[in-house]
């Protein structure tokens, strides 16, 4: 466990991790402070951050399991202690770590008698099992158990539907949220009109990411939500009388991109994350693995630089060029190509 003394800054707004510990493979804890804040700001940030931590961060889970010769979810299999339903519930609890999108396939194929754990899951290299000791089933006889698994990355939760059973496979009620809990508290200090606040933020995660990583992801997601307003031109709305209703146009991401044509400052480009460029999942994952997270990062690379990225194709570069030209009237640096 790491614990640091809290020191109050009276000048620049800054955050700090004051406590960090690993309670188990599937329970990480972190406590952070942000200060100094004006009165009321701590509550505004704390509420928004808590909701973003619990609802906006993506996780990777097993979403479907396929058994051979199983008639329904509540069947029992000779030689296995658990019912099919209990095995599905155990698979639901498996904690995975992955940055890839789309549907991935995995499997379990073992022979008893033995205990089946998360370590027996055969998954793609891009998927990491956080706790390989998690129990799945106990085989009491020399039988074969083969289960086909489907892995997905998403946010929030997904409830299985009765008509979603296909080819002997069973959907799993899935909770994609990697943050188990988040709390915030406020400490006030100072006197009179100079009263200020410190925001304390506590984060518990399931081990697929650290509380610090969760804080970064939640902050980035909140920034993404507000970006459309950053460069929006002010609209003058004239209401002549109560019978005439003026409709305010929605500020879309593409409106904001058009405004960037007038403002190409680095600080603006650093606020645009590649998540917003609507790239195919394959291209997006290649860029993320190369630590290209923002538009500023992307524009810091030439075409040749992108082609050096593992698994990157000419078609991917052309697609990026089209997006940059269409939305930003920009191009990648040419002097290095």
Curated annotation (Swiss-Prot):
Top class in the EC scheme: transferase
Catalytic activity from the UniProt record: RNA(n) + a ribonucleoside 5'-triphosphate = RNA(n+1) + diphosphate
CDD domains: RNAP_alpha_NTD
Renumbered residue ranges of the record's region Alpha C-terminal domain (alpha-CTD): 266-337
Localization: Plastid, Chloroplast
Keywords: Chloroplast, DNA-directed RNA polymerase, Nucleotidyltransferase, Plastid, Transcription, Transferase
Lineage top rank: taxon: Eukaryota
E.C. code: 2.7.7.6
Major site of localization recorded for this protein: plastid
Single biological process term from Gene Ontology: DNA-templated transcription
Region (Alpha N-terminal domain (alpha-NTD)): 1-233
Pfam families in UniProt: RNA_pol_A_bac (PF01000), RNA_pol_A_CTD (PF03118), RNA_pol_L (PF01193)
Alphabetical list of SUPFAM superfamilies matching this protein: C-terminal domain of RNA polymerase alpha subunit, Insert subdomain of RNA polymerase alpha subunit, RBP11-like subunits of RNA polymerase
Quaternary structure, from the entry: In plastids the minimal PEP RNA polymerase catalytic core is composed of four subunits: alpha, beta, beta', and beta''. When a (nuclear-encoded) sigma factor is associated with the core the holoenzyme is formed, which can initiate transcription.
Family note: Belongs to the RNA polymerase alpha chain family.
Function according to Swiss-Prot or TrEMBL: DNA-dependent RNA polymerase catalyzes the transcription of DNA into RNA using the four ribonucleoside triphosphates as substrates.
Free-text comment about domains: The N-terminal domain is essential for RNAP assembly and basal transcription, whereas the C-terminal domain is involved in interaction with transcriptional regulators and with upstream promoter elements.
The protein's name in its UniProt record: DNA-directed RNA polymerase subunit alpha
Lineage of producing organism: Eukaryota, Viridiplantae, Streptophyta, Embryophyta, Tracheophyta
Gene: rpoA
């Amino acid at each position: 466990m790491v614990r640091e003394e809290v020191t109050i800054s009276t000048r620049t707004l800054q955050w700090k991790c004051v406590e960090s510990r690993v309670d188990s493979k599937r329970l990480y804890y972190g406590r952070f402070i942000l200060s100094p804040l004006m009165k009321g700001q701590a509550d505004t940030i704390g509420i928004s951050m808590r909701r973003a931590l619990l609802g906006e961060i993506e996780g990777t889970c097993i979403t479907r399991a396929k058994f051979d010769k199983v008639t329904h979810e509540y069947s029992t299999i000779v030689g296995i202690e658990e019912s099919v339903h209990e095995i599905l519930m155990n698979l639901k609890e498996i904690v995975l770590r992955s940055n890839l999108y789309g549907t991935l396939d995995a499997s379990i194929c073992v022979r008893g008698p033995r205990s089946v754990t998360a370590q027996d899951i055969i998954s793609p290299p891009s998927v990491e099992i956080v706790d390989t000791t998690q129990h799945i089933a106990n085989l009491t006889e020399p039988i074969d158990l083969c289960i086909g698994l489907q892995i997905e990355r998403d946010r929030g939760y997904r409830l299985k539907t009765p008509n979603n059973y296909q080819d002997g496979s069973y959907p799993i009620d899935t909770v994609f949220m990697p943050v188990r809990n988040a709390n915030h508290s406020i400490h006030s200090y100072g006197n009179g009109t100079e009263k200020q606040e410190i925001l304390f933020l506590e984060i518990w995660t399931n081990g697929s990411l650290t509380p610090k990583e969760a804080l970064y992801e939640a902050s980035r997601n909140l920034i993404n939500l507000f970006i459309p307003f950053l460069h929006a031109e002010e609209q003058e709305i004239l209401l002549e009388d109560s019978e005439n209703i003026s409709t305010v146009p929605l500020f879309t991401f593409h409106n904001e991109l058009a405004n960037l044509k007038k403002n190409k400052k680095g600080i603006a480009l650093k606020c645009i994350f590649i998540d917003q460029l609507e790239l195919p999942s394959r291209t997006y994952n290649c860029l993320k693995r190369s630590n290209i997270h923002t538009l500023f990062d992307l524009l810091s690379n030439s075409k040749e630089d992108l082609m050096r990225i593992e698994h990157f194709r000419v078609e991917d570069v052309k697609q990026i060029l089209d997006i940059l030209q269409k939305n930003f009237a920009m191009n990648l640096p040419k002097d290095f190509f």
